[in-house]
Swiss-Prot record:
GO terms for molecular function: tryptophan synthase activity. Keywords: Amino-acid biosynthesis, Aromatic amino acid biosynthesis, Lyase, Tryptophan biosynthesis. Disulfide bonds: none annotated. This is Tryptophan synthase alpha chain. The alpha subunit is responsible for the aldol cleavage of indoleglycerol phosphate to indole and glyceraldehyde 3-phosphate. It comes from Buchnera aphidicola subsp. Schlechtendalia chinensis. It catalyses: (1S,2R)-1-C-(indol-3-yl)glycerol 3-phosphate + L-serine = D-glyceraldehyde 3-phosphate + L-tryptophan + H2O. The active site is at residues 49, 60. The gene is trpA. Tetramer of two alpha and two beta chains.
Amino acid sequence: MNRYQTLQKKLVPFKKGCFIPFIILGDPSIEMSLKIIDVLIENGADGLELGFPFSDPLSDGKTIQKAHLRAFSSKMNIYLCFEMLQKIRKKYNTIPIGLLLYANLIFKFGINNFYLKCFNVGIDSVLIADLPVEESNDFRKCAIANNISSVFVCPHDAKKNVIKKISLYSTGYIYLLSRSGVTGTDKKIIVPSLNLIKNLKKITEKLLIQGFGISNSKQIQKIILSGISGVICGSVIIKLIENHFQNEKKMLKNIKRLSRSLKQSTIIF
């Protein structure tokens, strides 16, 4: 049983959804990034979705683009990211940790080398934002060889043949897209249709986790009530980092409050 399955087993009987925050490693610095992760986990995060700083993050809106730049300003690179991941896994042995990255970053490092490194530092899953499932064969082979779960994005308007393929190849969880476009909290999100959720649940028992633009309790409650397993929230957290990173105490206090609120919203009474 992998960590996502363990999380699912823990949540389902109690009618709870999972809250998974997303941040960029090294934003705004290595030390502060590690403190942010501590605060998130201590205040409700059920898992982590983490990004490596990347020079051309096409799927990201302005808020997360700035996070990539702040991480680069703190001299982050792929090797320091793996060092951070090793520390995080050593401290938090039971929670699922996934990476959300871009294909070129992995390709430059060497696909098999990358997945081997992920295995060595205890990563559970890798989602490649700009990799269509139809072009994923080389990446999936290396993921399987190194015991890393693959995650693919399922659009809210996905056709049945796409749903089947994503359900088959996503071995960690299935990422449900709130809408098309780039990340950010300034656009309306879409809860996938009950028909899509029903079709997915017919063919898979994996966690269904929705991301992209989720920023408040009302959105989360609507998502969980629709039958989705949990949410990934990134921009709303990263905006707090952007606004307060020059005042660490205030930043961590605000992230603590937000994390508690977002987690509480996943619990259905």
